[in-house]
Amino acid sequence: MSRNFELLQQAGLNLTATVEMPPTLERELGARVKKENGGSRAFAADLDRTAKEETLKLVQSVFLLQGTSTNHRAVVFAAIDSGSGCSRVCVHAAQMLAANVSGSVCLVDANFRTPSLPNAFGTTNHYGLADALRTEKPLRGFVKALDRNLWLVSCGSAGEASTNLLHSEQMKRRFGELRKEFDYVLIDAPPLNTYSEGFALGQLADGLVLVLEANATRRETATKVTERLNATEVKILGAVLNKRTFPIPDSLYRRL
């Protein structure tokens, strides 16, 4: 049994998907962000075939095969540690979901300390969630259209001092508005091992997708975070093993 899957098993997690981002592609995306002066549209087409398949599997498992009576789903994406690629997983899941459903999909950047979703789409970060939490203006005024059925609420005028807003009663009200306005809501949250916002947001959502970094996330840390999620009654809808690399050709690996 590999170290990665042993980690998942001992932490009591069921693997939903493994997402590989080839180093060459990651460098290309980074270069494109700089070239386009701070923005890059990280479309799902940027993923290789295997990553697309895994992202589709994640979307089907979490959003489309739950057997619920309604399509309204609100899910938090949160990594255990920083630097695990959670925002990228969340972005590609939203794009894949929007491409496979007729309903509306909304991405929400709730990572106030290190927001990244606007950069992924080459749009601005101003006038977003933090601003919406300070006013009673209609939520639609803080939403940016990205595609036919894909929308974004950036973090807005946020910062370290604004994180308490994510624990507020106004956040509960805004979350309710998001559910009414959109068929699917995907929230990118801060890492769970360092900050508490992901737990609070998970309690408002239908559940949480946990993102782990292959060969980096420690078993003890994963277990501690999982236990706290259970204690706070946050449902874990899936676990994603990100940044996994294949030392042998993928076509051969998948036959093993």
Which role fits each region the language model picked out?
Residues 1-256:
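P-loop NTP-binding module
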